[in-house]
């Protein structure tokens, strides 16, 4: 199994002094980050579809063995709620595939008010191009076998999100995994337990994408490093 472990985002001035050097320019944060981690989750794409120049800059500043997980546009997940958005989906996917091998999964994070609608999800999955994707459901009504089976039918990952308000069932729906570890604080034992869970999926997953919450204190990179060290040891 390949482990892709990092944080949600990388460009935080609050990290200067505890992760980034105090005098590091913002423009050099991504290369610095990419020397230490192999992936990051980009929230920028939730607000706007990136320009070609942005895609090229991301590629130029990272090594070949680096992966960008991209949050799908809110126009798809929040405004349209997966309905009647084929043009936006097609355009977004066309743009981001220019990342080539650096493209990781696309995260479709649904709003908490969006309750289960299996027909809508099924229709959307039929329109989704052949690419790695993960769905983060933030309403518990989605957590049942009907939804998990739909994801399995398209080899789409259920995003296993661990938050202070909701914990996603640890259901395996694809041959890769996607974890978002979002609680305010994780102990060393917590990180160890999650690393053990990831290791246990070695027969199911070829790749595991794992993202810690960024946190203003800069604890996210430290937790990501802890998990990397644990998985490299085992």
Regions found by a protein language model. Name each.
Residues 1-234:
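Residues lining hydrophobic/aromatic ligand-binding pockets adjacent to catalytic sites
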